[in-house]
């Protein structure tokens, strides 16, 4: 009888963002007759943590350092390595599965353990500019398997890595969405509702979203963003501009639970993605599944998902042009079953089967 492989997943926090939700779905779906699973989080308090299966071993890797830690480091002790050793001594993994390029630095510790390594890349070019060159060198030299989230990422890495690369097409958990939508809350009021979702950041185009809202100040259209504020200057500036009343028909909803999130999504008349760059774009897929047409800027990933069955990709980022596209789509009807069929090629169960084969062979 074959021995089960022990996989230790590393990820940021299991909050409800695209990369974290994909990782959660993988952890939840892997065949327990083939794999034992542990997960290491860099931060506590993730929204998905309470929903982890009971058989998952949960660890926290402290990423901050006290004054005493810094003194020990200057005396020659590798504090982070010792923290990893404590986790590894308890779990005794065969594979480290590292989620997102931000955590690629963990690959430098692999030489201290008898493990294989996987790195799951959800990011695209903009994100690579934000990390050190050493992280890419580690990806190339130290990852036994690199897993990309879309064909866009595949184009970046396939020729470079050869058989060390595979694409795991990101997909949404439609069964979970269905459970969240068993009770539908009717939309209040008669305003047209335009929704966006994701971290309130420059890459996601929050500034474009806000500028667009001003074209509808004297209409019955409201703009709602579902997402959390990061702690940076860009977010702080725009948060204060909203508080000052510059964007009167914009709401930021950052405290919704999962059911409230999907109900808000389904209650929209249009989903608006203003992203400057996406490697995929799961929130657009969620909107389409909920029967909400999508207007998306040409972010890369949007062209993989959005078509004339479910919305439109706009190749002009100017708010004047986008505002006209919004008006056009608000007056156009879409058929929900055709919308869902338009994204049916993104099959999460099939992707899990492919991933299990890779993990079994590594």
Positions of the model-derived regions?
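Carbohydrate-associated surface elements
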Residues: 152, 171
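Glycosyltransferase donor-sugar binding loop
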Residues: 40-46, 197, 222-236, 254
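Short, structured helix-loop element that forms part of the nucleotide-activated donor/catalytic region
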Residues: 50-51, 224-248, 260
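Aromatic "clamp/platform" in nucleotide-sugar-dependent glycosyltransferases that forms part
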Residues: 276
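A conserved mid-protein helix/loop that constitutes part of the nucleotide-sugar donor-binding site
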Residues: 20-25, 201-215
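Conserved acidic donor-binding segment of nucleotide-sugar-dependent glycosyltransferases
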Residues: 308, 312-319, 328-333
